[in-house]
Swiss-Prot record:
Keywords noted in UniProt: Chloroplast, mRNA processing, Plastid, RNA-binding, tRNA processing
Source taxon at top rank: Eukaryota
Transmembrane segments: none
HAMAP family per the UniProt record, alphabetical: MatK (MF_01390)
UniProt keyword Cell membrane, yes or no: no
Keyword Chloroplast: yes
Chain segments annotated as coiled-coil in the UniProt record: none
Protein name per UniProt: Maturase K
Higher taxonomy: Eukaryota, Viridiplantae, Streptophyta, Embryophyta, Tracheophyta
Function: Usually encoded in the trnK tRNA gene intron. Probably assists in splicing its own and other chloroplast group II introns.
A cellular component annotation (GO) from this entry: chloroplast
Principal localisation: plastid
Amino acid sequence: MEXLQGYLEXDRSRQQYFLYPLLFQEYIYTLAHGHGLNGSIFDEPVEIFGFDNKSSSVLVKRLITRMYQQNYLVYLVNDSNQNRSIGRNHFFYSQFFFQMVSEGFAAIVEIPFSLQLVFSSXEXERPKSHNLRSIHSIFPFLEDKFSHLNYVSEILIPHPIHMETLVQILQCWVRDVPSLHFLRFFLHEYDNWNSFITPNKSSYAFSKENKRFFWFFYNSYVFEFEFLLVFLRKQSYYLQSTSFGXFLDRXHFYGKKERLISACCNYSQKTLRFFKDPFMHYIRYQGKAILASRDTHILMKKWKCYLVNFWQYYFHFLSYPYRIQINQLKNHSFFFLGYLSSVLINPLAVKNKMLDHSFLIDTVTKKFDTTIPVIPLIGSLSKAKFCTVSGYPSSKTIWADLSDSDIVGRFGRICRNLSHYYSGSSKKQSLYRIKYXXRLSCARTLARKHKRTIRTLLQRLGSGFLEEFFTEEEQVLSLIFSKTTIPFPLYRLHRERIWYLDIIRINDLTNHLDWP
């Protein structure tokens, strides 16, 4: 524990003391605005209420001026908690200012983590590989490692935790007392903290707000959990929040945590002891984590007990054991990053001949397999109004007012994204069915717009219409393998798994598969 405490103190030695004055700087809000927050309040709600995007800078200056007034933030929070009956313009200003303060403060408190990334990169050279930023880079790791493992624990990271715990976590990195007081005020005065954690679509205030603010504190909590879980000697990655909840890992997206040293963790006079496990692997994305091991089932049960007590005594969070499921890999498939993954066991008979004697040896081969979860994906398409619950394609009614090129372009992007994301599936037939459903949904949308039947529409547009739904993947793959000397027939590409190393976020249509 003394070694761990010393590491914690050394790692957090660069604490920041002067962050609160940045809240009054205009460039902080400009930084938050240009951080790639798709669909943030800086764009859409301004247009909804009759303002244009250029007025955002004026509102920022107006906010900074009013923040110098005494108790203005108290009035701001109180107004944001009221309904729209207080007046249309007054409600808009309250909501807009409240959102700017939350996103601006989130940009400020990210500074200590940004500086830590700079210092740690200067102290120790890190391998510069942009491929590690891709989500798909994790699957070659799974293919290489998971076929040799026996058990896997699927962990749903518990949330939300108490707001005071979030403040205490941030206090380890920030020693600016005004900033901490401001954070406590911001959280305690906010009546609907649970809506921060689980945004309610029926509420304007939470449907598009607070994403950056929430993701930063959620990942601060997850980072603290992982930091203390494996007792890392150095910070292995940097979390930078984005609007959709994925976080680009600037160093290693995954890693093999070797030699998990026997540790004694004292939680309320209780001691938990663990043994070394050189084949333990930990992978996390969003709210789900996977802990896999080649060891016995009892060791996995010890880890489960440890995690439950860890959340309870360190984070003061009542974690239920059912949130951690232990399964044997050879008998279980698990959802991860939109894929249904499993380890296939293929029996193999090998004939060995020595002199006049021959032997028949029975053995097995293990292979990590990834397939498309068709039923959940159809459910996601159904929620997006592309098909019915049973998978029958339907027209996208809200797109009927767009031009033909826009309609085809939108459906084409959806099919290309699905094709790229699920290119690593071992069974492409399911992917082709999904793409066919999207193609037919596009045709139905165009037919609804022009008030024609699908057959009449396709006859008028020609047979070459909608070819981009199917031809782009073959063109890309044929270009990749055209320079190889080994013959690689195109029909074999449909059975090969191709991992694209430029995918930095999970597809929206599969995002719900990985959230608890």
